[in-house]
Amino acid sequence: MAGSFAQLARAAEQSRDTMLVPKTALETPPLEIHTLGAEVLRQSARRIGKVTEQTRELARDMLRSMYTAKGIGLAAPQVGIHQQLLVIDLDLENAATPPLVLINPEISAASASIDTYEEGCLSIPGVYLDVVRPTAIELSFRDEMGRPRKMKADGLMARCIQHEMDHLNGVLFVDRVTDEAGLQKELKDHGFQRQHVQSVS
């Protein structure tokens, strides 16, 4: 049965296998987050065959790097590792709230309703532009212990999951921007090049 993010979070809180790491910035994050123009961001990620302690430690290092960069989501390809692994935390202020770890995520359904919302990305710092996405999704994935899970998400959580899952296919949010003038201005203002955007229909 699909559960909400809150239900999954409560279940994680009640177990010993949470992925809690301090939600504070480190002087030197364990992983480098690659930025627009890096070829590693355009490569597809591979499914993870077996979830191991090495997988969990990668997720922890991703969280440490994400918190240091003050982000709410990070995909393994952003740190140069082409595995289907995402970490998300929409509650950065609450140290006790566990993050969400998604391994081999697959969207099984998306709402017909769509909305437009401003997105940013740790791989394109400073750039914020509107992107259209389905309002709600249903997905299946494995958690940090390798257990199969199902989940329904809407609002910011649905958008964040879709954004991070794009990274697994070498797609960045700027590829989905339809405001060409705004895109060119934002990229130029923050030192990025339009030629590194690969627009998708």
UniProtKB/Swiss-Prot annotation:
Fe cation binds at residues 121, 163, 167. It catalyses: N-terminal N-formyl-L-methionyl-[peptide] + H2O = N-terminal L-methionyl-[peptide] + formate. Removes the formyl group from the N-terminal Met of newly synthesized proteins. Requires at least a dipeptide for an efficient rate of reaction. N-terminal L-methionine is a prerequisite for activity but the enzyme has broad specificity at other positions. This is Peptide deformylase. The gene is def. Keywords: Hydrolase, Iron, Metal-binding, Protein biosynthesis. Belongs to the polypeptide deformylase family. Its EC number is 3.5.1.88. Its cofactor is Fe(2+). The active site is at residue 164. The keyword Protein biosynthesis applies. Pfam families: Pep_deformylase (PF01327). The keyword Ribosomal protein does not apply.
